[in-house]
Regions:
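DUTPase catalytic domain/fold
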Residues: 1-136
Length: 136
């Protein structure tokens, strides 16, 4: 996958060869206030493979240890810098230094089927049974 970096940006990397997510880092120090949010421009540009999208997914360690979450969607044709919004669900400010990991990019295949309006769906075993319908 082709990657371009703005000045000061860090090359995405995997912690282990088989990790699904590519770690993205902040090029600048940033504070995410308690119960607040902050926007980080990673300076990373990607040319996603045809038929794929990129999901920005929280780093599990940041989520579990520091209550920091993130999410986002990068469409195949987007080549601008990846920007992520970090949410702090905890009661203390969280400081990131330049070079710290802030989120991870997971590249996934996407099916883009044409839409067709219908008046009813074919019957399925589950139907429209939702929350709690399968029991405990």
């Amino acid at each position: 996958m082709e990657i371009m970096l703005d000045d000061g940006a860090y090359m995405p990397s995997r912690g282990h060869r088989t990790d699904a997510g590519l770690d993205l880092r902040t090029p600048k120090a940033v504070t995410v206030p308690a119960y607040g949010s902050a926007i980080v421009d990673t300076g990373v540009h990607v040319a996603l493979p045809h038929g794929c999208a990129g999901l920005l997914v929280s780093k599990s360690g940041l989520n579990v240890r520091h209550d920091i979450t993130s999410t986002g969607l990068i469409d195949e044709g987007y080549t601008g810098s990846i920007v992520v919004k970090l949410y702090n669900h905890g009661g203390e400010d969280h400081e990131f230094e330049a070079g710290d990991k802030v989120t991870q990019l997971v590249v996934i295949p996407v099916v883009c089927e044409p839409l067709e309006r219908v008046s009813a769906f074919n019957a399925t075993e589950r139907g429209d049974n939702g929350f709690g319908s399968t029991g405990r």
